[in-house]
């Protein structure tokens, strides 16, 4: 399998696809998802998924980014295949803000959901903005994002995954606002930290077998957790 680019999308297609993964990575990492998330996405492709990942540069208007991502995926839609939306960190937020409210997918998997304010996400902004007399916040901001999630999203299968050593994760807060709450949405905890999904495998590439280790095992468990949940979920 070889990565192919279609405008802002990077595609990885197995010989026979059983479904489509629409992936959005985190802020910064999402600019080159085919590199930053290579091992996870290739593991999913090896399990029979057609992987589509959207590349983007971070900005303050998250609603605009969400619309752009949705349009990008829509331009490459495979109507005969089921769709799983997969996001990491800020990518979770962008999927949840999609203009179709998730109706274009059968399910969503959200890794390390993050919904911090701009001054928390960009520490220097918190220091400079008061001095410059300006205020900058993501649109929508954290509170408005949760209100949109709670009031506009339909109830559908969603898997939230947090990592044991992740200090940035807000999955538990998200679970309280998702339609259906804990009764309908599942939260799993795996070993790792906030960057576990983004392990690119550079050590393995440079060092061969010496590069294998905890990161690879964490990624294998993550890919398997996603696959098992997809197979067991209720439609």
Locate the predicted segments by residue.
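Alpha/beta-hydrolase active-site loop
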Residues: 59-80
């Amino acid at each position: 399998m070889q990565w192919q680019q279609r405008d802002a999308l990077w595609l990885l297609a197995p010989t026979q696809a059983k479904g489509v993964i629409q992936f959005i990575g985190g802020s910064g990492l999402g600019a080159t998802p085919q590199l930053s998330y290579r091992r996870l996405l290739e593991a999913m492709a090896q399990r029979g998924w057609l992987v589509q990942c959207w590349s983007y540069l971070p900005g303050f208007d998250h609603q605009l980014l969400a619309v752009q991502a949705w349009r990008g995926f829509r331009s490459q839609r495979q109507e005969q295949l089921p769709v799983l939306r997969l996001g990491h960190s800020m990518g979770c937020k962008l999927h949840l803000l999609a203009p179709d409210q998730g109706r274009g997918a059968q399910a969503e998997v959200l890794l390390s959901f993050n919904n911090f304010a701009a001054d928390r996400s960009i520490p220097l902004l918190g220091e400079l903005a008061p001095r410059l007399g300006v205020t900058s916040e993501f649109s929508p901001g954290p509170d408005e994002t949760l209100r949109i999630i709670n009031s506009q999203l339909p109830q559908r299968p969603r898997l939230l995954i947090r990592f044991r050593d992740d200090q940035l994760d807000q999955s538990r807060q998200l679970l309280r606002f998702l339609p259906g709450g804990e009764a309908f949405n599942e939260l799993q905890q795996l070993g790792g930290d906030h960057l576990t999904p983004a392990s690119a495998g550079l050590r393995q590439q440079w060092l061969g077998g010496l590069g294998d280790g905890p990161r690879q095992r964490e990624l294998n468990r993550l890919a398997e957790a996603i696959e098992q949940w997809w197979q067991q979920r209720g439609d």
